[in-house]
Every structure is written in C-alpha cells, then in structure tokens.
Amino acid sequence: MPAAATLSPRMRAALAVASTILLIKASELLTLSSIPAAAGLGLLLAGCVLQWASLDGAVSSLVLASVVAIGGPLAELPFIELGCWHYLAPTYFPLQPWTGDALGLSPLTGPCYFAVTTDAIALGRWLASGVEPPDGYS
C-alpha cells in the first residue's frame, strides 16, 4: 500500500504534479551537470520509483509508466529526424546501425515520461473520483 493511501485523490494528484515538476527539473540539472549519464539515469529512476511507490503502488501503473518510459522517447525519433527539435547532449542512439549519430536521445528522457505518466494516472483517478456512474451501472 502506498504511503499516501490515506490521502484524497485530489491531494495525491497534487503531490504527483509537484513531484513530477521536481523530477523534470532534476533532469534539467543533471543534463547540465558533469555527473555521468548513467549516474543521472539511476538517480532519476530512483526518484520515479519513489514517486510511484509512495503515491500509487499499483502494478498496472508501474507497467504502464514503464512502457511509456521506453516507447515515449522512441516516438520522438521521427520528430527529431524532421528537425522539430534535438537534444543538447544525446548519448543514446537506438537506431545507430542505420542512422549513425543523427537520431540521438538523452537517456534522462525516459524517466521524465515515467513521471508524467504517474502524474496523469493520479490526475485521472482524481477526476474519476467525482464522476457518478450512469443509471444501471455500478
């Protein structure tokens, strides 16, 4: 059971948003720091797991956030190819055998997707907590 289980869905959503903001800011600071990418990735992943464990704790949420953490950054590759944006210090090149160093990602992007997914789940639960089911449904 998560540490915040006794809190209302609204408070859990607020804590999820606040912790996501902190994790994304930490990602920025780690990107600009001299800390090795692997260490920064470990720190962010630990923060994400702490966020999930303390605010949610559901295995289904962990699976969903993990899938999004992997698939989200990969879904950015077409936009990087089109020149919509690029990363300042890409060190992860998932398509390197075919594209060389043209399509690079920051390894810190995945944990940000994880945190935002945990955030979205908490917001969804809060919004759903005030919704009454239609007649005939329970």
Language-model-detected regions and their locations in the chain:
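Aromatic-rich, lipid-facing transmembrane alpha helices and their immediate juxtamembrane interface loops
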Residues: 1-138
